[in-house]
Curated annotation (Swiss-Prot):
Localisation: Cytoplasm
Protein's recorded name: Polyribonucleotide nucleotidyltransferase
Gene: pnp
E.C. no: 2.7.7.8
Catalytic reaction equation(s): RNA(n+1) + phosphate = RNA(n) + a ribonucleoside 5'-diphosphate
Cited PANTHER family: POLYRIBONUCLEOTIDE NUCLEOTIDYLTRANSFERASE, POLYRIBONUCLEOTIDE NUCLEOTIDYLTRANSFERASE 1, MITOCHONDRIAL
UniProt source species: Psychrobacter arcticus (strain DSM 17307 / VKM B-2377 / 273-4)
Lineage of source species: Bacteria, Pseudomonadati, Pseudomonadota, Gammaproteobacteria, Moraxellales
GO molecular function: 3'-5'-RNA exonuclease activity; magnesium ion binding; polyribonucleotide nucleotidyltransferase activity; RNA binding
Occurrences of domain KH (ranges): 558-617
Example of a GO biological process term: mRNA catabolic process
SUPFAM superfamilies cross-referenced by the UniProt entry: Eukaryotic type KH-domain (KH-domain type I) (SSF54791), Nucleic acid-binding proteins (SSF50249), Ribonuclease PH domain 2-like (SSF55666), Ribosomal protein S5 domain 2-like (SSF54211)
PROSITE patterns on file: KH_TYPE_1 (PS50084), S1 (PS50126)
Amino acid sequence: MTMFNTIKREFQYGNQQVVIETGRIARQANSILVHMGGVTVLVAAVVKSDAKEGQNFFPLTVNYQEKMYAAGKIPGAYGKREGRASESETLTSRLIDRPIRPLFPEGYVNEIQITATVVSSDKTQSADIAALIGASAALAISDAPFNGPVAAARVGFINGEYVLNPTLEELKESDLDLVVAGTKSAVLMVESEAAELSEDQMLGAVLYGHQQQQIVIDNIASMAAEIGTAKQQYTAPVRDQALETGMKEQFGAQVSDAYTITDKQARYSKLNEIKDAAIVALAGDAESESYSDTVSELKEIYNDLKYRTVRDNILSGKPRIDGRDLETVRALDVQVGVLPFTHGSALFTRGETQALVTTTLGNTRDVNMIDSLAGTIRDHFMLHYNFPHFSVGETGREGIPKRREIGHGRLARRGVQAMLPDSDRFPYVIRVVSEITESNGSSSMASVCGASLALMDAGVPIKAPVAGIAMGLVKEGERFAVLSDILGDEDHLGDMDFKVAGSKDGITALQMDIKIEGITPDIMEQALKQAHAGRIHILDAMNKVLPESRTEINAHAPNYAVIEINPDKIRDVIGKGGATIRQLTEETGAVIDIDDAGTIRIFGENKAATKAAIAKIEAITAEVEVGKTYEGTVARIVDFGAFVNVLPNTDGLVHISQIADERVENVSDYLKEGQIVKVLVQDVDNRGRIKLTMKGIEQS
């Protein structure tokens, strides 16, 4: 009798063979082991059978982790253990969470924890697709009321062709890195960066990925059917009809009027005032045992009333919350150079959303070293997004970036990264920081706009300005409305969050999260069309202030220069044990990097520091010229002449017969060590030996 009851499915997925199995590892949880190409991921899902008392939100937690042993590596952190989640791991956790969360029933609050662990990797591909497939399969075989399965695909675009699940090497040649996740019938999530692809090309990639992932969904469904786990029966609590009727009849008109208040804080204040009045009017006796439950139910009913009011207004053709029509972008204000001592800065305001964005240029020592399964990554570009509580008029503890901030920062980075110059052309390390100072929707896209402006203000020669816009959707049956430049409320109460960034020529980043099924290609096409019009409108406003990068690097930024030397002279610049280059750095304050080909990159604090470093290096590496007179120092006296140092690390011989016009019997009668003399270079032989003469040269 075998100890394990293993069930597995095998299938070809692009160029990778995929094996999904359960029943052999982590049997006390709903576990799946996914082998995909050279990657193995263990995914375990634990589903609580009951909700915690008083639980009022869905406590779904996804943790993705990469174990260094998976690639045969020992962690470099203190204690040689894996530390807290890296930025990449956090982003993958979000990637798994986003398409899974909408597939649970509304009101379901049982705790679910999903842990995805990369346990083996050949370092040729990312493990995120395998992890998401594993999470979907683990939930499918569990008793959770999960309306899946869901699957994921990565799509590249190489030589004009879509490529399914490209390797890391293939992605280097690809104009697209897109991840799409969905169910059998619907796309739920898209995450991508691109090199200015068209709307049609991006939509084609989404549809291609969704079509290709059907084989994954079929195999997961087949496995779940074979296992046959009975699902938890969840029925949403029945609302008190009298409370719903009372709320709508007494306060429906007031809520509708409140949603004509264009100022966010004033609108929120009015809506809270109406909510408090509704509780007083409808909750009954505050001393009764059921009072707190009634208040909780009334708050849910009130939220539903707000939800229905906003959506009905939009679908009936009424103006949006702030008075706009479906396609109008909020009022824009663009300023650059707002912070005098930063290297580049911009203040981008769109309605009640505002980003203060800075660019800082650093030298090669500022590069971000990232330890990953694939090896150490040298990241020359960073974009950090900060969302303080005051940006929405709230208080709270400030600390390390939360998952949302990391995700928004990565999206903004994707939006501008394709426009950055190659590091060979522009070797600076670049750090962009977006401080969200006001927020009412689409702060990540404001960060894209602000980042583009701050980079240009710093003198970074980006290929083209970039702008971003967030689109929304309200859909009821066959009726739908696509909204341009959504507010925070429209994001919260709508069915789709669709963010698009790009230049005038194409899309550089696209992120989509859909909360409902039934989003058709026609709807996505309409959203992309409106996003294009909105993006061009925003770019026009930005270009009126700063149409292209400044021609010179900001005066406060490090000054950069590159020079070439004879590779044979590299050792002279470095010196014994690095003594010479350390001295150069200490004397000039410049950062100096030398490669094996003799290319020297110099970053000075200012132009003077860079020039000083260049002058010293040129002196060290200078070659003597035959026929040229030099002033040198007598370095050593020998019987047959004297060695004179004419250049740093360069000595030549003045033979005893070349010291004076008359015959010299004793060199020491004419020269002393340390004496300054003028010499003429007579010859340099094929071994590099330098012959000098003092004859006929007037000595001072």
